[in-house]
């Protein structure tokens, strides 16, 4: 599904500086510097769902102790993440676990293309960081009431359930979270704008994610012993 040039969602591309302040590139450059200055065991990369996670106490509680870096940029698509990873954000580091969460902003792409873009990210990480275990977080439902974007995100997750097991070192973590109630509505207590998560919403995602990360870190006992020593 990640057919290279035939899939626009799998073609690396820097974000267009529409607003004119070059903040996207500034953030990317800061991440590249972080790669030179820090030694993360866990790397998070993606869009605002990753970026905003560090604004809540649960990041400091669960992920900061794991020497985690947060390379999330609001508005990013699979194309933008691919470009960033190809241009320095995987250099000078050797993380044990890499968490990928991106795709809900790929508005110009079909579900098949989005899934292919995510697969391309996984394949790139496998090439550049072969020691890393990769966790792909499933796309969340969005919008207060049922809508086509919810259906599209759900289809992306279904496609990834089939395709990701064929790739190395990766697993999909598709957390239900109970965000969609029995009447089909999403609560602002979970997603304050019916897209981005509240602190309580993040807790529903981050706790099972943290458990999986810890399991993967435990699978490298020799490295853990070295770290403790």
Swiss-Prot record:
Additional detail: Originally the subunits of the type I platelet-activating factor (PAF) acetylhydrolase was named alpha (PAFAH1B1), beta (PAFAH1B2) and gamma (PAFAH1B3). Now these subunits have been renamed beta (PAFAH1B1), alpha2 (PAFAH1B2) and alpha1 (PAFAH1B3) respectively.
- Which positions bear N-acetylserine? 2
Q: Which N-terminal stretch is annotated as signal sequence?
A: none
Q: What is this protein called?
A: Platelet-activating factor acetylhydrolase IB subunit alpha2
Q: Indicate where the modification Phosphothreonine is found in the sequence.
A: 220
Taxonomic source organism: Rattus norvegicus (Rat)
Q: Which reaction does it catalyse?
A: a 1-O-alkyl-2-acetyl-sn-glycero-3-phosphocholine + H2O = a 1-O-alkyl-sn-glycero-3-phosphocholine + acetate + H(+); 1-O-hexadecyl-2-acetyl-sn-glycero-3-phosphocholine + H2O = 1-O-hexadecyl-sn-glycero-3-phosphocholine + acetate + H(+); 1-O-hexadecyl-2-acetyl-sn-glycero-3-phosphate + H2O = 1-O-hexadecyl-sn-glycero-3-phosphate + acetate + H(+); 1-O-hexadecyl-2-acetyl-sn-glycero-3-phosphoethanolamine + H2O = 1-O-hexadecyl-sn-glycero-3-phosphoethanolamine + acetate + H(+)
Q: Which residues form the active site?
A: 48, 193, 196
Any inhibitors or activators noted? Beta subunit (PAFAH1B1) stimulates the acetylhydrolase activity of the alpha2/alpha2 catalytic homodimer.
Residues where Phosphoserine is found = 2, 64
Q: In which tissues is it expressed?
A: Expressed in heart, brain, spleen, lung, liver, kidney and testis. Not expressed in skeletal muscle. Expressed in fetal as heterodimer and adult brain as homodimer. In neural cells, expressed in granule cells, astroglial cells, and oligodendrocytes.
